[in-house]
């Protein structure tokens, strides 16, 4: 039987890491105090639920992860600001800059990149009708300048691999060595 505290399930021994997409309540997430965890900034939602913030590099076990969550909503005209759409769905200039600085600190080498949307070149293959924006442009720069083993992303509601790029929707994967 699950244990709940303030309506949030508590899972002793299980750690859940989350990264923002575009439909999260960014105001609520950003109301949590910023802490440091495994080399990067986080919000502890509970001791076992951790929000991995944008532009951070984390060392988890012997692997390094770069995170840049967020995306532009293509349906925001049907949504209500502060209820089903948040202006903070896209990263800020400070988050973009901090991300590049953090990547520079690790010599532009990480094991994994986690993002919600794709870099420009990949997005053209996945959803050519989506317009490029500041975030997809930024991720294209990351793609061209950072060495990585695999890149995992969501946003497009498909499960499909494009070489070392993995678009996840319903699939659950296990990271290997």
Language model: regions and residue ranges:
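Short, low-complexity intrinsically disordered segments
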Residues: 35, 83-84, 149
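Residues at the C-termini of beta-strands that transition into short coil/loop
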Residues: 20, 55, 69-71, 155, ...
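Cap/insert and terminal regions of metallo-dependent hydrolase folds
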Residues: 111-156
């Amino acid at each position: 039987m699950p244990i709940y505290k303030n309506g949030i399930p508590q899972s002793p021994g299980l750690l859940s890491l989350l990264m923002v997409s575009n439909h999260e309540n960014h105001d609520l997430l950003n109301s949590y105090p910023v802490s440091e965890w495994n080399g990067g900034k986080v919000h502890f939602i509970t001791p076992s639920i951790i929000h991995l913030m944008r532009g951070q590099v984390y060392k988890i076990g012997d692997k390094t992860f770069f995170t840049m969550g967020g995306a532009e909503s293509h349906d925001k005209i049907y949504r209500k600001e502060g209820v089903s759409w948040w202006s903070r769905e896209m990263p800020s200039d400070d988050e973009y800059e901090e991300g590049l600085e953090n990547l520079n600190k690790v010599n532009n080498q990480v094991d994994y990149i986690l993002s919600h949307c794709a870099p420009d070149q990949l997005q053209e293959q996945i959803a050519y009708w989506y317009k490029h924006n500041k975030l997809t442009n930024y991720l294209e720069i990351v793609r061209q300048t950072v060495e990585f083993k695999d890149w995992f992303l969501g946003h497009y509601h498909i499960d499909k691999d494009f070489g070392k790029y993995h678009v996840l929707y319903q699939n659950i994967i296990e990271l290997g060595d």
